[in-house]
Amino acid sequence: MKGGQAKTSLSVNLAARIAKARRDVLLIDSDVQANVTTIFQRDHVCNLANLILGRVQKFEFIELDRHFYFLPSGETEIVEATQSLAQSRQRETFLRKLLEPISQGIVIVDTAPSWSDLSRNLLMYVDYVIVPVVTDYLGYSGCDQIMNYISQFQRQSLGQCQAEVLGIAITRYNTRTNLSQTIRKGLQEQWPELMFSNLIEETVSIQEAPAFHQNIFDYRSGRTRGAYMYDALCKEIMKRIAQREKERRSHGQVA
C-alpha cells in the first residue's frame, strides 16, 4: 500500500469499467488524502468516516453514473475514525460488520498508503487484494513488503482473514528505461502466478483524465491508448475473479 503506485487510478478505472459492463459497483475512498473524492469533486455527509463514528445511520451513496456508486472517505475525519477503531472492542472486524448490509454487487476500496487499524479492518472485509506496482526500485521493494505484511496478518488472524492476493498489476511502466524492464522481469520471476499479463504504460491520457475529473473511459470518449490498456487489464482482473470464485465454490468457501 505504498504511495505513488497509482492505486487510485487503478481503483477508479476498474470500478468505471465494471459499471460500463452494466454491473453494480461501489467505490469506497478510505484514504485521508481523499484522491478519489478530489477526482470526482463529490462529497456527502454519508461518508466512511461518519459511518465508522456513528454520525450517520443509513447508507446513502453518491451515484456517479449508471451502476457506478461512490462512498467518500470524509477526508481528514478519517483520521479520527481510524483512532476510534483502535479503541473498539471489535478492533479488526468492526468495518466488516458495519459494511455487511451493502447490496451493491462489487465493492472496490481505494486504500491509504500506510498500515493502520483501518487497513487491517479492510483486509478483514475484502475478498481480494490487488497490489499495484510502479516499475522502479521503491515500487519493487514496496511490493515485497506488502506481500509479507498480508501473509503475516493472515497468520495472526488465525483464519479470520479470508482475503487473498488476486494479483500484482504494473500500473506505471516506462518503456524507455532498462530499469523498468528489469523490475518487470524480477516481479515475474518472484511471483509468476500472481502477475497480470496486461500492464499500464505511462501515457499522457492517464495523467490528464483525473485533472478533468473523469475516469479513463470517459476522458476523450475512451478513445485513448490509456483506455485501451486499462480495458485489457480490467478484463483480465474480472476473468481472474471469476476463476477464483469458481474455485471457492468448488471448495465450499463462501465469497
Where are these regions (language model features)?
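P-loop NTP-binding core
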Residues: 1-255
